[in-house]
C-alpha cells in the first residue's frame, strides 16, 4: 500500500519577497478565474482534461505559434511557466466547481442560496524543482526559491528552521520529496514537502487489530480513540 506523508519546514524571518510572490500569484489566479468564466461554455465542450488545459493556456499565453486572446502576459510579465500553469489549473478548478454547483442549484429550482463565484482566493504556489526550487548545499539549512521582488523573478536564498531540517535529514534522507508548496500558518511561512512510501498491511484478522481513529474537528482539537 502506498501512503503519503508531509512535513512543513519553517522559513526563518528574513528580508525575502515571499509576500510579494504570494500576492502576484493570487492576483494571477483571480484574473484567470475572470477570463475562464467568460469562455467556460467553449472550454466545457472539450472533454479531455489535458486538451482543455492546453486550450485554456493558449487563451492567455503568447508563443511563436500562438497569439493569446487576453493580456495575461502583459499583466504578469516573465512569470515562470510552471507557476503560470499552476495558476491556470487552480482557476480552471475554481470555475468548474462553481459551474457544477450552479447547475445543481438551478435543478433544485433555486431553493437554497445561489452559488457565488469568488475571485479572491487562498491559492498557494508550488515551487517546482530546478525551475523554482533548488536545494542548498548538503547539511546546510537553506534552499533557493525563485521569487518576485516587485519588478522581476529572481533566485533568493532562504534560511530554513534547523530543527525541521534535522528531522527531514534523520527521517526522510534518501527518499524523494515532491515539489514543495508554500504554506502560511499563524503569520509564518513554511515549505511543505510530501513523501511517498510503500508499506505492507498487516495480515492480522480485522477483529484482532487495534485501530486508531482521529477526528479533526473544525472548531475543536483533534480527538483520538
PLM region spans:
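Nucleic-acid substrate recognition interfaces
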Residues: 1-225
Amino acid at each position: 500500500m502506498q501512503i503519503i506523508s508531509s512535513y512543513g519546514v519553517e522559513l526563518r524571518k528574513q528580508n525575502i519577497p515571499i509576500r510579494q510572490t504570494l500576492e502576484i500569484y493570487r492576483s494571477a489566479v483571480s484574473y484567470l478565474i475572470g477570463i475562464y468564466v467568460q469562455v467556460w461554455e467553449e472550454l466545457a465542450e472539450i472533454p479531455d482534461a489535458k486538451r482543455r488545459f492546453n486550450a485554456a493556456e493558449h487563451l492567455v499565453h503568447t508563443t511563436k505559434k500562438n497569439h493569446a486572446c487576453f493580456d495575461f502576459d502583459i499583466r504578469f510579465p516573465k512569470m515562470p511557466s510552471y507557476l503560470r500553469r499552476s495558476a491556470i489549473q487552480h482557476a480552471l478548478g475554481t470555475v468548474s466547481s462553481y459551474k457544477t454547483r450552479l447547475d445543481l442549484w438551478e435543478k433544485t429550482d433555486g431553493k437554497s442560496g445561489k452559488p457565488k463565484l469568488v475571485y479572491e482566493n487562498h491559492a498557494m504556489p508550488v515551487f517546482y524543482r530546478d525551475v523554482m526550487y533548488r536545494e542548498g548545499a548538503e547539511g546546510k539549512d537553506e534552499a533557493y526559491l525563485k521569487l518576485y521582488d516587485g519588478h522581476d523573478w529572481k533566485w533568493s536564498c532562504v534560511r530554513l528552521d534547523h530543527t525541521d531540517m534535522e528531522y527531514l535529514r534523520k527521517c526522510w534522507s534518501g527518499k524523494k520529496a515532491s515539489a514543495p508548496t508554500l504554506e502560511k500558518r499563524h503569520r509564518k511561512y513554511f515549505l511543505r514537502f510530501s513523501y511517498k512510501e510503500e508499506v505492507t498491511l498487516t495480515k492480522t484478522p480485522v477483529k484482532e487489530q487495534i485501530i486508531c481513529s482521529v477526528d479533526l474537528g473544525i472548531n475543536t482539537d483533534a480527538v483520538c480513540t
